[in-house]
From Swiss-Prot:
EC category name: lyase
Biological classification of the source: Bacteria, Pseudomonadati, Pseudomonadota, Alphaproteobacteria, Rickettsiales
Catalytic activity field: L-aspartate 4-semialdehyde + pyruvate = (2S,4S)-4-hydroxy-2,3,4,5-tetrahydrodipicolinate + H2O + H(+)
Organism of origin: Anaplasma marginale (strain St. Maries)
Underlying gene: dapA
Coiled coil: none
Cell compartments where the protein resides: Cytoplasm
EC nos: 4.3.3.7
Protein name per UniProt: 4-hydroxy-tetrahydrodipicolinate synthase
Length: 301
């Protein structure tokens, strides 16, 4: 498996009573597919996986796989700070038919680099599914070394890394990782720089709201149209900044509510966007013409 392109870190729709909105989720996945993305990543940070019980987690993963129907890749979040729990989740996504499992570096425990390696090796050896390593020190309080990333990447079924430490690291990782391992940016603001340094794609939050724009950035870079890509990257960066103006995914869900994709509901301890945050998000969506485009699309249906 070679991972290339834009993969949406999928938001999870909730109803007003905060139960899963399965109909909205299926519709959202279909819209993502029609917008040209390469894959979806359900049950990650943006999907509020920390607030889903195991039954809900299984429902979201199954529904994404069933809706995708092989048209795009499904890389299901399966990480935890507990190795046995991570193995259980990885075995589930394997049995459900996911294309790969996204495994985050264990958080809260703050293990050593050797502990992180042994965690990934245990998950790898207990399963038979391709694995994408997720390095996000902003949330785990651990930034594992390049050498440890290399050791993990040498495990046979590790096929990618989602790295959120900046585009500067991509070239260094590219030089030491096996060819089979894709380097995926975890930051929309630096996605273009990551591509230019040898990155294979992006696991994107912004593509929840502007999937066509995120795909266009990837396409323009692939075609060598760097000046045009820089213009698109500037727009995506502005959108990315406002989608993190308050704790994510509250701004993303509010943006999607304006676009008619899902309610703005989030589960505690997250709260819905403040009025000032709502104004900021709406202003950026209007500046980028995303609301008008969405209304025009609905009028054609």
């Amino acid at each position: 498996m070679k991972l290339n392109g834009v993969f949406t870190a999928l938001a999870t729709p909730f109803r007003d009573d905060l139960s899963l909105d399965e109909r909205a989720l299926a519709s959202f996945v279909d819209w993502q597919i029609s917008s040209g993305i390469s894959g979806i990543v359900p049950c990650g940070t943006t999907g509020e996986s920390a607030t889903l019980n195991f039954e809900e987690y299984c429902t979201v993963v199954r529904l994404c796989i069933e809706t995708a129907r092989g048209r795009i890749l499904v890389i299901a979040g399966a990480g935890s700070h507990c190795t046995t729990e991570t193995i259980s989740r990885a075995l589930f996504v394997q049995s459900a038919g996911a294309d790969a499992a996204l495994i985050v570096v264990p958080y809260y425990n703050r293990p050593s680099d050797e502990g992180v390696y042994q965690h990934f090796r245990a998950v790898h050896d207990a399963t038979n599914i391709p694995i994408v390593l997720y390095n996000v020190p902003q949330r785990t309080a651990i930034d594992i070394s390049n050498d440890t990333i290399r050791r993990i990447a040498e495990l046979p079924r590790v096929v990618g890394i989602k790295d959120c430490t900046g585009a500067e690291r991509v070239a260094a990782l590219k030089a030491i990782l096996p060819e089979k391992v894709a380097i995926l940016s975890g930051e929309d603001e630096t996605a273009l720089a990551s591509y230019m340094n040898g990155g294979s794609g992006c696991i994107s939050v912004v593509s929840n709201v502007a999937p066509k724009m995120a795909v266009e950035l990837y396409r323009l870079h692939a075609l060598g149209k760097i000046n045009m890509a820089k213009q698109v990257s500037g727009n995506l960066a502005a959108l990315s900044r406002v989608l993190f103006i308050e704790p994510s995914p509250s701004p993303t869900k509010y943006a999607l509510s304006l676009m008619g994709k899902m309610r703005p509901k989030v589960r505690l301890p997250l709260v819905e966007l403040t009025s000032s945050g709502q104004t900021a998000v709406k202003n950026v969506l209007e500046t980028l013409d995303l609301l008008r485009q969405q209304k025009a699309m609905h009028s054609q249906l």
